[in-house]
Amino acid sequence: MGVMVRCLQSFGYILCIYTVRFALCDIYMSEKQRIQSGAETKETRSRLRQLVWSYSITGMPKEKYDPPDPRRMYTIMSSEEAASGKKSYWAELEISGKVRSLSTALWSLTHLTALHISDNSLSRIPPDIAKLHNLVYLDLSSNKIRSLPAELGNMVSLRELLLNNNQLRVLPFELGKLFQLQTLGLKGNPLAQDIMNLYQEPDGTRRLLNYLLDNLAGTKRVSTEQPPPRSWVHLKEPDRTRPAALFSVMCYNVLCDKYATRQLYGYCPSWALNWEYRKKSIMQEILSCSADIISLQEVETEQYYNFFLLELKEHGYEGFFSPKSRARTMSESDRKHVDGCAIFYKTEKFSLVQKHTVEFNQLAMANSEGSEVMLNRVMTKDNIGVAVLLELRKEMIEQSGKHLASMEKQLLLMANAHMHWDPEYSDVKLVQTMMFLSEVKNIVDKATRSLKLSSVSGETNAIPLVLCADLNSLPDSGVVEYLSTGGVDSTHKDFKDLRYIDCLTNFNCNGKNGTSSSRITHGFKLKSAYENGLMPYTNYTFDFKGVIDYIFYSQPLLNVLGVLGPLDPHWLHDNNITGCPHPHIPSDHFSLFAQLELLLPFSSLVNGLHVPGCR
């Protein structure tokens, strides 16, 4: 709808001669050349309508973004249509008429996606404009604006910001936070020459925004408060009536250096993405928890040997690492940048018995059974998992005044994996998880036989399991259902109706010769340490926030006593942190940390006699 308004009182006070246009479509922009130069031509309009914007100027992939026809169309609803209850939708507002000030009621129109306030007499823009968080297009050209509010930098949905022909002498550094901005119009402003020189370079908008963002943290207007400590969530008291061993586990995706780019994380300053800066905070995060066992994902090969292993050895750890399978075919210079999974353990509490690497592409090839989807979808992904079989040292065991049953050693299997990332490949993630659990079960079974271990209570799994992983799967996924419930049906929706059934039975806990069933099981009784929404998200980026990292432990031998809770959401909100990494948060993942209790066999008393074998 469009109407010429002389007295528009719904905005709180009279605004003289406003033109209000309400568009029925996604309102965006007129052509880019008009924005840059202040001129408009039919030729440029036609040419720019053919452009398809798929990436922001920082390179972050976004939803397809098509500039609409700049000749915006609108209709006026008739009285009959209004009387019949016809609903209107408008996402664009245009105000004209040499307006000098704006009503505060304007900031309540949070549904707006485009706001045209050019060719007026505005000298300032209120900070409340940031309340229009859905704006993708903002035209403030040809006014008398002398300064911009810092809050403008919080309008991270903006794709077009037009400031041509104003009286701006400086730009707030906060504008650098507009990482999705594709076009910035600055012509006709008395800005400093160094700013204009940067702006006029090829790809000048991106360069200028990067400059502003990189220098933002050095200004006094930015809060540099560290995030508050994460709270400890107590879940259960340890069992003091029997011998038990207490130990702690950390799971942490540290964000490999080669993935930490402005193309993926345009909201983070480049200096805060730099590995030399981030690695200090990452190590501080790891050491602050002082976990007995540490599982890391996205560890670069070179950084494992030259940084993580060296640093953690000084604090009493030993480690095991394997890179992704692609490292096999690379030169030595390229191989050192391949990421993988690592496990570290405190040598004062554990000794290494065995170590294993599980390559999913090799397992897929060996178990394809002629399945094309197994070969074409699973085998082509080179994710890996690692596992270490650890023996608890005697100093770890708390006897609690009870008699330990006769036992040669107490073992623990620690597994760590990183599944494929792409949301479109839920089938691959599920198959990778099945393959990993199948191999983990083989490790447990072989270790039990070769080391002649048996559960004194007759349980099939004498070796408890702790599984840490970046599963790249949400809690309602088939992957988590498979782990939590013991199995999943071969017709699960995450398989995408692709024919895996011929090869899935190879990963069933009963093996390919087991009982015929459409349900694929793993044979463990696993439980997540973080249940009931204890963590609202483990991965926190601008585009995605959700739980994809997990610590699972096997029952009944293991219990969780407590976990490290989430980062205070108020701190994130109050500091307008829309995604990580951040200068104070070195990865796009939050670490998980849990204290576990391992129940040990003990001898009970019957008529004053010790009877071994109780769990």
Language model feature labels by segment:
Residues M1-D128, N134-Y137, S147-A150, F173, ...:
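The feature captures the LRR N-terminal capping module
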Residues S103-T104, I125-P127, P149-A150, V170-F173, ...:
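Intrinsically disordered, low-complexity regions enriched in proline, serine, glycine
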Residues L186, V249-M250, L467:
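Residue-level marker for buried hydrophobic side chains located in beta-strands
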Residues L191, L255, E300, H420, ...:
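Catalytic metal-binding/acid-base residues of hydrolase active sites
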Residues L213-G340, Q410, T433-S438, N442-S455, ...:
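N-terminal, active-site-proximal structural segment of metallo-dependent hydrolase catalytic domains
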Residues T219-L246, I293-W421, K512-G523, I551, ...:
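Structured beta-strand-rich core segments of catalytic domains in phosphoester-bond hydrolases
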Residues Y252, L296-Q297, A417, C468-D470:
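Active-site flanking residues adjacent to catalytic metal/cofactor-binding acidic residues
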